[in-house]
């Protein structure tokens, strides 16, 4: 028995090349595949990130939102504040172009994402209330937002996004649908 662990294959390698897990190799690294991200296997994405809607306000037309007044409202609008920002791992590249889910409805991110908060437009979800769950990526009702949208917007890969999720974001690990 060898005292050494020898590997060459990560998720996509082991999905595409049998040589990655045959002699002399005795270990594989299936890291990203464990989150459901491996194009060769067409896995179900299992990572999700949630936050809470902590404030809702109606703002008049021409109000500006975010640092540097990055977004100007064209009409009177319902605007919400989400308790998550770039310190939690939301890419700044999602400012004024990304989306979240509230009650299963796609809501645009407006303005520049700040360190601790993200502002969203709630005009399509007038029933939204403070405390509602906001899906940053994952599934809600029959809707889904993929983490791939974040990596595409940032021009990077999934590993960068997953590793960039901040330390203050609580991790919950599930097995067979139940939290451990």
Task: Go through each PLM region and give its residues.
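Active-site anion/phosphate-binding pocket segments in diverse small-molecule metabolic enzymes
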Residues: 1-180
């Amino acid at each position: 028995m060898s005292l050494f662990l020898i590997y060459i294959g990560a998720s996509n390698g082991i999905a595409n090349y049998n040589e990655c897990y045959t002699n002399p190799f005795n270990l594989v690294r299936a890291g990203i595949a464990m989150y459901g991200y491996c194009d060769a296997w067409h896995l179900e994405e299992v990572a999700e990130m949630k936050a809470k809607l902590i404030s809702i306000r109606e703002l008049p037309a021409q109000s500006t939102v975010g640092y540097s007044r990055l977004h100007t409202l064209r009409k009177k609008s319902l605007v919400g504040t989400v308790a998550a920002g770039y310190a939690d791992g939301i890419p700044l590249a999602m400012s004024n172009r990304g989306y979240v889910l509230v009650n299963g409805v796609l809501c645009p991110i407006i303005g520049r994402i700040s360190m601790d908060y993200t502002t969203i437009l709630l005009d399509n979800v007038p029933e939204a209330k403070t405390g509602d769950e906001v899906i940053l990526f994952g599934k809600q009702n029959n809707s889904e937002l993929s983490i791939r949208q974040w990596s595409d917007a940032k021009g990077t890969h999934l590993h960068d996004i997953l590793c960039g999720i901040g330390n203050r974001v609580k991790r919950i690990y599930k097995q067979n649908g139940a939290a451990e």
